[in-house]
């Protein structure tokens, strides 16, 4: 299970090369190379779960509006994770290794501190069918399922854990 992730809310114009490189180093490189190095230890029935994000699939409804984060580089890193999941699942499936991801929406963590403002919380809740901010346990429960025998026929998937965002 790889849960590498940092975020930087910034417009396209405001991102620096350093921001971009740091996001990709943390969000893409840091899960890629440990998995590569550990592959010899993975046998049939092993599972790899990466953490993607709702940001890889949707854009904010009103970019630039107060409370709406702009995350183009972060979203690109999480899109890269979703691509890795598909490629790794195809390559490692022959060895009986499953590879999946979870794609959390807004989860109450330090990374979603924008929800601490009324505007940010309103933005987050406006996207979700279930009308609450997700909890870390919501994501952990899906990860536990993905590594269980109950998910033995699932590989190459990215499971949204987002309260029905953008339905």
Give residue ranges: language-model regions.
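Active-site helix of classical SDR
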Residues: 35, 77, 85
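Residue(s) in the substrate-gating loop at a strand-loop-helix junction
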Residues: 53
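Catalytic Tyr-X3-Lys loop
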Residues: 6, 13-33, 49, 74, ...
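Short, small/polar-rich loop/turn modules that mediate ligand/substrate recognition or access, typified
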Residues: 93, 98, 154-156
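Amphipathic alpha-helical dimer-interface segment in Rossmann-like NAD(P)H-dependent oxidoreductases
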Residues: 26-46, 56, 89-90, 94, ...
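C-terminal helical subdomain
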Residues: 82-83, 101, 123-154, 163
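Substrate-binding pocket helix/loop in short-chain dehydrogenase/reductase
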Residues: 11-12, 16-24, 62, 70, ...
């Amino acid at each position: 299970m790889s849960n590498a992730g940092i975020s930087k809310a910034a417009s396209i114009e405001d991102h620096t090369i350093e921001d971009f490189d740091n996001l990709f180093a943390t969000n893409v490189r840091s899960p890629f190379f440990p998995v590569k190095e550990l592959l010899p230890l993975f046998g049939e029935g092993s599972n790899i779960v990466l953490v993607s994000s709702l940001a890889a699939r949707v854009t904010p409804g009103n970019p630039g509006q107060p409370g709406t984060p702009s995350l183009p580089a972060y979203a690109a890193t999480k899109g890269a994770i979703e691509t890795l999941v598909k490629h790794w699942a195809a390559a490692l499936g022959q060895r009986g290794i499953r590879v999946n991801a979870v794609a959390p929406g807004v989860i109450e963590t330090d990374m979603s501190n924008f929800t601490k403002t009324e505007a940010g919380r309103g933005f987050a809740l406006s996207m979700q069918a279930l009308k609450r901010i997700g909890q870390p346990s919501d994501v952990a429960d899906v990860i536990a399922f993905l590594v269980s025998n109950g998910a033995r026929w699932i590989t190459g998937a990215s499971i949204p854990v987002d309260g029905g965002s953008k339905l």
